[in-house]
Structures are given as structure tokens and as C-alpha cells.
Swiss-Prot record:
Alphabetically ordered keywords of this record: Coiled coil, Disulfide bond, Glycoprotein, Secreted, Signal
Coiled coil, from the record: 57-111
Domain of life per record: Eukaryota
Any single Gene Ontology cellular-component annotation: extracellular space
Family statement: Belongs to the clusterin family.
Organism lineage: Eukaryota, Metazoa, Chordata, Craniata, Vertebrata
InterPro entries in the record: Clusterin-like (IPR000753), Clusterin_C (IPR016015), Clusterin_N (IPR016014)
Designated name of the protein: Clusterin-like protein 1
Amino acid sequence: MKPPLLVFIVCLLWLKDSHCAPTWKDKTAISENLKSFSEVGEIDADEEVKKALTGIKQMKIMMERKEKEHTNLMSTLKKCREEKQEALKLLNEVQEHLEEEERLCRESLADSWGECRSCLENNCMRIYTTCQPSWSSVKNKIERFFRKIYQFLFPFHEDNEKDLPISEKLIEEDAQLTQMEDVFSQLTVDVNSLFNRSFNVFRQMQQEFDQTFQSHFISDTDLTEPYFFPAFSKEPMTKADLEQCWDIPNFFQLFCNFSVSIYESVSETITKMLKAIEDLPKQDKAPDHGGLISKMLPGQDRGLCGELDQNLSRCFKFHEKCQKCQAHLSEDCPDVPALHTELDEAIRLVNVSNQQYGQILQMTRKHLEDTAYLVEKMRGQFGWVSELANQAPETEIIFNSIQVVPRIHEGNISKQDETMMTDLSILPSSNFTLKIPLEESAESSNFIGYVVAKALQHFKEHFKTW
């Protein structure tokens, strides 16, 4: 025997198409016609059931696609996490190396720091870079260089507890990955269970379906995704983006090479600056060149640059101090400047890997949320059909009673105030009363459609959750 919901719906449709819907005038005929719904058997399968079965298969195919995407995302996420840990390990190694070099250099330069500091803070440096604007970038570079030297000569001892949040963060990341895996696995189990129950319904009703639908349902061909699939707010990453990998050893070697060239550049610019300062007296001794620097600059800078013409002898002392400072740095601390640059780049590498991991993590979470949303939406739309597999073959729809109930309006009872009520027992749901308003009477062309819609709505509302 067909599942009772199917029989109920198709009988209603048969009544509608046959134009034999009962009228309000003949309540006895109404009662007998409604009771006969469960006795009609040889009718084609209802389109609502076919639509629901098709939707369940679409749900299954969608989940298979999402599972592949989720697997790729999780694989990329774990790979990014490994690279982030490698970057942190590399940073720790650079820090340890730098700390050792700083310790040795600190011992060598402690006595000569005064000369280096006066070199940096001397007014001649300020005057010269003001009068020669093209050297301002050189000055900034040198100042940054000396600030780093000062920091390691007089280090600020940070609290070692900063390592604790890192370990806690790793534990938190492990928990996040595990939770996402568990949630997606549960979604997969739920969808497979729903599909298996719905497939049992298809097997029970297979003889009632046409051959085209049977072939369509049992085929492995991908179906077009349902029209209600929501569009993702983000464009999906390309495969190249997902599989991007940092070659950390080679990448870091580039940083090392770059840092060496920076140090050499700093040393070279210091030498050029000092040589230029040394040549200034020769220029001032030339005829008609007195105050040449002041004449070449705007009014607000002339006074300052005039000091350079008047204090050349003092700037020679500045020149000598900077030469000593440069010699101390190059001889006693050859590796420290390069290591500071390497440390900066190692920190940048850690930040880049953290940012990359965060982006992939956000994308994976969004993918999981979208998948859960689609599963819930499709389950609510089509999942009710799986409950038909739980019904015994002899289960039928039973119409217990039919009655017309008048509504009292200002003490008058009229035919237009009557409401038809029928008690139904449908599938696993408890008995319920269907109230049919006057505008949906049996004389109306919408009568059967109204009853069908109400029956399906009642069943879906009482469809059990996962």
C-alpha cells in the first residue's frame, strides 16, 4: 500500500481535477467523499514526494562537494599552522643568536659608547643634514642604526611570561581545529542518515514512479544545485592561493643577504658623509664661495646653515669621533647590525604567517557556517519525506468527523458565517482539526490546494529534528 500521505494528497488532487468536490449544501456527501480519500489506490506518485526526494539527493551531492572543499581547507590550514610554527622557531633561533652577539658586543663597546652617542647627537650632524636635504634619508637610516645599538647596550628586560600566551594560543588553536572537524563530521553523518532513510522511501514507492524519475534518482550524475543556495559573501580562493607554501629556508636566506647589504650601505653612507664634511673647508677657502651653502637654501635655513661655515673646526672633531665609532662597530660588532635586520625580517615573517593562518581560518569557519546553513535549509524543505519510511504499510489517513460550525455575529447566524471543521489522523502526528474558512469552501477552485497545503504544513511542523 502506498504511504498514506501520498494517498491523501493525490486523492485530493484527483477530486479537484475530476470536478467532484463536495458542496456545502450536501454535508452527507462531503463526509462520505472525505472518508473515501484513504481508499483510493491506483494514482500516480505525488509531485511533492518526488520533489522532496530530488531535494534530498541534491543535499547529498552538495554535502559531498562541501566535504572535498572542507578537506582542502583544513589541509591548507594545518599546513599554514606548521609554517607559522616554523617561523616562530626561526625567530627564536635568531633571537638567541642575537642575544649572544649582543652580550659580546656589549662588553666591547661599553667604554666607547660615549663617543658613539656624541657622534649621533652632535649638532654638526643636524646642521649638515639640514643644509644638504638629499642626505636626510641617510641621517634617518643612521639614527635608526644607532638606536638599535643603544637598545642592546642598555637593554630593557622584558617579562619572560610572554611565552605563556604563545603556548596557550597553540592549545586554543588545537581546540578550534578539533571542534571544526567534529562539527563537519556530524553534519556529514546527519546528511548520510537522512539520505539513507529517504532512499528507503524511494525503494518502497519505486513501482509508483515513472522510469525517468527512477533513473534520475539512482544515477550518479551531479544535479544542478537548488535555486535557494545562498551566495557566499566572499569569493572562493583559487587553488594556487590555497596551496601557497612558504619556502622558509630560502626565504630567510634572502633576508640574510638583504640585511648584509643594508649594513654595508650604512657603512658606506657614513664614510661618504664624513668625506663630504672633510671637503667643506676646501670649498669655503675658494674665492667667492663664502656662505655658498646659506645662499642656496631658503631663508628659514640660512641661519642654521651659517653655523656650519662658522664651526668647521668643531665639526672636524665630530668627524673624528664618528670615525672612531664606526671603527668600533665594524671591528668589535660585525654581526650585530645584520642580526638586528634579520630579527626584524624574522618578526615580519611571523606576522605574515599569522596573518595567512588567520585568513585561512576565517575562510574555513565561513565555509563551515555556510554548509551548516545549507544543510538546515534543505532539511527543513525536504527532510519530511524521510519520515515516510517509518510508517507501517497499513497506516492510513483517517477522517474521524466532519461538522459545520456556525459563528455567532451579533446574535445572527447565517450560511456565510459557517466554518467547516474536520478531524484528521495523519501519519505519526496526533489527531488535529482542520478549519476551512468560507472563502476556501468546496465550491472554490482553491479548496483542494488549500487542504493539501495545510496537510503538508502540519506534517512539516511536526517533523522531528535531528
